């Protein structure tokens, strides 16, 4: 499907943009600048831990909870994180392997059961907020999308990457660590900080040698929405290439789908297919 979109885009001669809003968040733009200036040397490893504290509400109480509806949360949720790994390192995934399972949600409840009608609503920890329209029972029988995933990736250039995604954590944030030959850079979303640790600093007991304080930005998605809107207008009005290209979107989707194929085949290594232009 993505390749058909790319071919149509090329044939049309029109402009196309992918809305990867995380590329526009200040905390990740700072990380990208640190990496691109060579501070941590030649990149060798990239790790992402995604604590999806609202996974039940966002993905298991509506259509996302079935493979027929969403295929995999390595795609529906993970495409942003996979893209960030690609963007921060400047390399795409070549092959992946993954393990995952349905470790919290799903069960034996009727598929048509909704939280407002459930006899256990007063005692269920996963009951939907009364104001939320996503209120299907997250323990219903049809739920078959994995809620706990681990994926490893080999990127172009030999970079090794890992992506961990859990949808029943008590907190909600992302943690990225990028490691190079001279040091590493890591972010803390809850604290609004980026840490840099250098190999030659001889301060191995300390968390960081440099700490960047990230100022809160106005606008949705951590201040990304106004910036991505401006980037879109620059593309439409002036022909400027957007920060996230259609190819970037396709490569993130392809890696996520390959990860799902792997975890559903016992963790077999899957090659990420090349674009069929």
Which role does the model predict for each range below?
Residues 1-7:
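Beta-loop-alpha module in the N-terminal Rossmann-like domain of NAD(P)-dependent dehydrogenases
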Residues 10-17, 22-139, 151, 266:
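Predominantly a Rossmann-like dinucleotide-binding segment in NAD(P)-dependent oxidoreductases
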Residues 148-150, 156-159, 169-277:
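C-terminal helical cap and adjacent loop that interface with cofactors, partners, or active-site loops
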Residues 91-92, 143-145, 172-174:
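Glycine/proline-rich active-site loop of Rossmann-fold NAD(P)-dependent oxidoreductases
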Residues 73-76, 139-144, 166-167, 219-223:
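Short Gly/Pro-enriched turn/cap motifs at secondary-structure boundaries
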Residues 46, 97-99, 162-165, 188:
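Beta-strand scaffold of nucleotide-dependent catalytic cores
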Residues 2, 28, 81-82, 229-230, ...:
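A general structural signal for well-ordered alpha-helical segments in protein cores
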Residues 5, 31, 258-259:
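Aromatic/hydrophobic pocket-lining residues that form π-stacking "cages" and hydrophobic walls in ligand
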């Amino acid at each position: 499907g993505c390749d058909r979109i790319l071919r149509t885009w090329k044939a049309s001669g029109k402009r196309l943009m992918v809305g990867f809003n995380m590329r526009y968040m200040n905390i990740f733009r700072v990380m990208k600048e640190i990496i691109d200036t060579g501070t941590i040397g030649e990149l060798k490893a990239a790790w992402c831990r995604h604590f999806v504290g609202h996974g039940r509400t966002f993905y298991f109480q509506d259509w996302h909870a079935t493979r027929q509806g969403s295929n995999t949360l390595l795609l529906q949720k993970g495409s942003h994180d996979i893209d960030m790994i690609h963007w921060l390192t400047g390399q795409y995934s070549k092959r992946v392997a993954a393990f995952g399972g349905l470790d919290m949600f799903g069960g034996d409840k009727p598929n048509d059961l909704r939280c407002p009608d459930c006899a256990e609503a007063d005692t269920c920890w996963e009951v939907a907020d009364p104001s939320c329209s996503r209120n299907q029972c997250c323990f219903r029988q049809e739920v078959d999308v994995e809620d706990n995933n681990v994926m490893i990736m080999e990127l172009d250039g030999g970079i090794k990457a890992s992506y961990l995604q859990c949808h029943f954590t008590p907190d909600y944030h992302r943690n990225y660590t990028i490691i190079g030959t001279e040091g590493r850079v890591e972010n803390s979303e809850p604290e609004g900080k980026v840490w840099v640790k250098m190999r030659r600093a001889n301060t191995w007991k300390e968390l960081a040698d440099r700490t960047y304080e990230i100022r809160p930005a106005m606008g949705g998605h951590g201040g990304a929405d106004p910036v991505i809107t401006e980037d879109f207008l620059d593309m439409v009005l002036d022909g400027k290439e957007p920060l996230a290209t259609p190819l970037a979107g396709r490569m993130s989707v392809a890696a996520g789908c390959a990860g799902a194929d792997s975890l559903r085949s016992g963790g077999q290594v899957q090659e990420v297919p090349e674009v069929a232009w």
